[in-house]
From Swiss-Prot:
Part of the 50S ribosomal subunit. Transmembrane segments: none annotated. The gene is rplA. It comes from the Bacteria. One of its GO terms (molecular function) is rRNA binding. GO terms for cellular component: cytosolic large ribosomal subunit. Keywords: Repressor, Ribonucleoprotein, Ribosomal protein, RNA-binding, rRNA-binding, Translation regulation, tRNA-binding. The keyword Ribonucleoprotein applies. NCBIfam families: rplA_bact. It comes from Bartonella henselae (strain ATCC 49882 / DSM 28221 / CCUG 30454 / Houston 1) (Rochalimaea henselae). This is Large ribosomal subunit protein uL1.
Amino acid sequence: MGKVAKRIKNIRKDINFNELYALKDAVSMVKERAIAKFDETIEISMNLGVDPRHADQMVRGVVHLPNGTGRNVRVAVFARGDKAEEAKTAGADIVGAEDLFESINGGAIDFDRCIATPDMMPLVGRLGKILGPRNLMPNPKVGTVTLDVANAVKASKGGAVEFRVEKAGIVHAGIGKASFGVEKIVENIKAFASAVIKAKPQGAKGEYIKRVAVSSTMGVGIKVDPATVRSE
């Protein structure tokens, strides 16, 4: 048996893939199996009872995880003048205007989150085909089109996670690292789930949270009882 096959066999050992585990138990199992040589990201995936092809069933938002994500989030900001200086002071990794536009248009996308002041949106909007599919387009609904660029940068650096439902009705996100304690991961997942629940669209009918699973970067998905992800 090869090394990869052996590793997968060990990861899958003692997991009942037909069972719905309590959140805390599932997180513990994922952590125990996160044995890669790097600090694996813990991820949550939620299947929702929505059809995002309909405008009244779109789910999107932003949540501030209480224990952060554990990763270094690179932030790009479209701004000029004083706002550009505010962004730099707040810790933005890339700040610019036309120069940043040209860089992105040329294929240089070295950031995880993009923020813009309102006056920059006519320029940024021209990058829709590049930023949109990567979920990087600034949007006022999630606080990334704003005059308060300093706080937006700090929020992005401090654990803000943007989410958006995909075509199949799935929303997912990295919510911590394998090095986090179980309780911290559980707290982050409950905060994320709470934000998704609050973002339930009026057009959603029937069961909203259908399935939940947690996994690590190199691990397998473990099914979670949806009732256990809700905040008490």
